[in-house]
A protein has these predicted regions:
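A general boundary/transition motif marking the beginning of the first structured unit of a protein
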Residues: 4, 129, 254-255
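Alpha/beta enzyme core
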Residues: 8-87, 95-229, 235-238, 242-243
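Extended, intrinsically disordered, low-complexity segments
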Residues: 231-269
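Actinobacteria-biased recognition of intrinsically disordered, low-complexity terminal regions
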Residues: 1-13, 269
Length: 269
């Protein structure tokens, strides 16, 4: 990759985009799956909140990565877009390989109040979509909604490709040239590779936090601009629910939890 001037701050920038251009202070983006989880995270002081496609799909009893979750994704965006935080929506692959259909989805999300969208090149069958197809989606979305922050994700480290670094570099270059505002590489935890990607990109790099991987401070030092939590919070909530039930069943004490009134307040009631 040959960047023009890596991480230069554009003259005009949305508040959400600006959170990606704070050297040494990456945006920590927690991911919600419903209104209550998003409201709780906003109340805790997070200025921007993403959605998790796995959490949204699983909470609705739907498979992650399937076109059936499109309606749930839009429905949740319409609810969350009315709140006071900056909302970025995990739109999977755009639920279509037709760039114009993906652009139409982006328009719906922007009209709902979303300021960012995540688009991934991984497919439900574990393969990668052709990079040209994904780049066309990115370009179509930017043409339709220029102010929407497009975070183009490659699943090169998740889809079993041989030599994932060269494949990721090739794809990220195609996506930033198509107009992506940022790029995302989940599954990457090697500090040396992260540093090389940051050096070669002209747009902010997003990394998925993972247990055993680099911490927030180390990622900041590597030049990462955004750190996402993905489905971690949803999976943690499931684990906490099961553990709490087990504690009650075995007579063990239960840890502190929000009160009834606190939860009601999250919905404004």
């Amino acid at each position: 990759m040959t960047p023009p001037a890596a991480m230069n701050r554009p003259a005009a920038m949305t508040p959400f985009a600006a959170l990606h251009h704070r050297p040494g202070r990456p945006l920590l983006l927690p991911n919600a799956w419903d209104h209550a989880s998003a409201a709780a995270l906003a109340a805790a002081g997070h200025p921007a909140i993403g959605t998790t496609s796995l959490g949204v799909a699983a909470a609705a009893g739907l498979p992650d990565g399937a076109a059936a979750t499109r309606a749930e994704t839009v429905r949740l965006a319409r609810r969350l877009g009315r709140d006071g935080f900056l909302l970025s929506v995990d739109a999977e692959s755009g639920f279509s390989d037709d760039p114009e259909e993906v652009a139409a989805l982006a328009v719906e999300l922007a009209e709902a109040g979303a300021v960012g969208i995540n688009l991934e090149d991984g497919r439900p069958d574990g393969t990668l979509a052709p990079s040209a197809v994904h780049a066309a989606k990115v370009a179509a979305v930017k043409a339709a909604v220029p102010e929407l922050f497009v975070n183009a994700r490659t699943d090169a480290y998740w889809c079993g490709t041989e030599g994932p670094e060269p494949e990721a570099v090739r794809r990220l270059d195609a996506y930033q040239r198509a107009g992506a505002d940022g790029v995302f590489v989940p599954g990457l935890g090697d500090p040396a590779v992260i540093a090389r990607l940051v050096d070669g990109l002209s747009v902010p790099l997003n990394i998925l936090w993972s247990p055993g991987g680099p911490g927030l401070a180390e990622l900041a030092g590597l030049g990462v601009a955004r750190v996402s939590l993905g489905s971690l919070l949803y999976r943690s909530a499931l684990a906490a629910a099961v553990e709490t039930a087990a504690a009650v069943a075995s007579g063990r004490p239960v840890g502190p939890v929000p009160g009834y009134a606190e939860v009601r307040a999250l919905s404004g009631s």
